[in-house]
């Protein structure tokens, strides 16, 4: 059973849903979307009662956007999947649940009303301030000094007004303070099967331009990243799910690794990489992650990665520069020419997303500097 919502559904995912005939919840958004299907078949739209029956009969659930979680929690609140959603979306509750895996990890939950009066003098620095529920780096701040704290509190007030996500996605009433997690950051698309066993579908390394950078500009994957991390991540997720208890459940998980130490940043329930960027796996090694999960299949990475040694596959998020002039336009020809091999370019115009779009690229060892350049660029060099 598929739940679609704004802000974005890729043509790749939409075409898969049309061709496969998977049941999709009928909403004004999906009715509009059905008329834009790349294939000749429309979406298989089902009304609320039939959708609920399918879900309760054991059909696997998947959503492209966490904006759709409200319906699931409202109509299916007594199902095990709803319990897993609640646990994963509440970062403070998840920290408490997993605390025995890392008993020395510092974290503290604070009501928004108490942020300005909280004494932070004894907290280990750097630390991170973020909403207990959040998405798309909304309200996430790295604090190294008292001045950083002051600026973060000002930004919290501003973010609360400007956030375009519903309350269930970005809850600005409770905040989590936690020690800064050092090490390399990764994002993992996986599902837990009917026995609760983790099945990893893709592993991204999240690259940053600096210590204070919290943007989503660049995610990379490839043979080297997957082979180095697949065994240890699978073992770690097995320990985690012994506490969460998810079954037949997809998730997109962000974590950091320092040496042999793995620490979670956040769990995003019932979906894979946001804004349909999970499609990266199809471009990188021919794997449709959603189809693999819905059909309970397990990827054979030895086969999928054959012949791809030395290749890096990237998802580049083209976020708009701050204070962008209203008449500014992206020079797409110049942008695409900056990369060795663009697998797909997705340019979008969605008011609620401050993005030009996304690029999926393939890069060999001799051209990795192109990734360093785009990571640090504010994209003004590609405007006219």
List where the protein language model places each region.
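N-terminal basic/disordered segments at the start of proteins
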Residues: 2-20
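Conserved N-proximal alpha/beta basic substrate-recognition cap immediately N-terminal to
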Residues: 29-122, 363-376
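ATP-grasp fold ATP-binding core
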Residues: 98, 123-142, 162-183
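Conserved ATP-binding module of the ATP-grasp superfamily
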Residues: 104, 146-182, 243, 374, ...
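Glycine-rich phosphate-binding loop of ATP-grasp-fold ATP-dependent ligases
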Residues: 127-157, 185-189, 209-225
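ATP-dependent carboxylate/phosphate-activation module, predominantly the ATP-grasp catalytic core
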Residues: 179-182, 189-245, 268-297
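Conserved metal-phosphate-binding beta-hairpin within the catalytic cores
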Residues: 241-278, 305-312, 317-324
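Peripheral (often C-terminal) accessory segments that flank ATP-dependent C-N-forming ligase machineries
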Residues: 294-384
């Amino acid at each position: 059973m598929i739940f679609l919502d704004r802000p974005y559904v890729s043509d790749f995912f939409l075409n898969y849903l049309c061709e496969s005939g998977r049941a999709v919840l009928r909403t004004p958004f999906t009715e509009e979307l059905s008329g834009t299907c790349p294939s000749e078949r429309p979406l298989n739209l089902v009304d609320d009662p039939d959708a609920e029956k399918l879900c309760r009969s054991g059909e696997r659930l998947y959503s492209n956007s966490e904006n759709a979680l409200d319906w699931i929690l409202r109509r299916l609140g007594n199902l095990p999947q709803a319990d897993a959603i609640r646990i994963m979306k509440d970062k403070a509750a998840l920290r408490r649940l997993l605390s025995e895996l890392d008993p020395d990890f510092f974290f503290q939950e604070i009501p928004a009303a108490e942020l300005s009066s909280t004494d932070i003098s004894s907290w280990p620095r750097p630390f991170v301030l973020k909403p207990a529920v959040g998405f798309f780096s909304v309200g996430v701040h790295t604090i190294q000094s008292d001045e950083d704290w002051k600026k973060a509190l000002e930004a919290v007030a501003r973010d609360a007004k400007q956030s375009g996500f519903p309350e269930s996605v970005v809850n600005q009433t409770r905040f989590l303070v936690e020690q800064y997690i050092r090490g390399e950051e990764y994002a993992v698309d996986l599902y837990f099967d009917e026995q609760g066993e983790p099945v990893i579908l893709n592993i991204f390394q999240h690259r940053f331009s600096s210590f204070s950078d919290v943007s989503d500009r660049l995610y990379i994957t490839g043979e080297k990243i997957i082979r180095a991390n697949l065994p240890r991540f699978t073992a770690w997720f097995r320990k985690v799910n012994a506490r969460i208890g998810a079954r037949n459940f997809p998730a997109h998980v962000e974590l950091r690794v320092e040496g042999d130490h793995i620490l979670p940043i956040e769990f995003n329930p019932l979906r894979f990489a946001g804004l349909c960027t999970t499609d990266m796996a199809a471009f990188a090694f021919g794997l449709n992650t959603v189809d693999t999960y819905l059909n309970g299949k397990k990827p054979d990475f030895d086969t999928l990665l054959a012949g791809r040694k030395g290749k890096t596959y990237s998802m580049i998020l083209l976020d708009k520069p701050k204070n962008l002039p209203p008449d500014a336009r992206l020079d797409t020809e110049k942008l695409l020419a900056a990369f060795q091999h663009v697998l797909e370019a997705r340019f979008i115009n969605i008011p609620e997303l401050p993005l030009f779009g996304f690029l999926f690229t393939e890069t060999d060892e001799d051209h990795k500097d192109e990734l360093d350049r785009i990571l640090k660029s504010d994209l003004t060099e590609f405007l006219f």
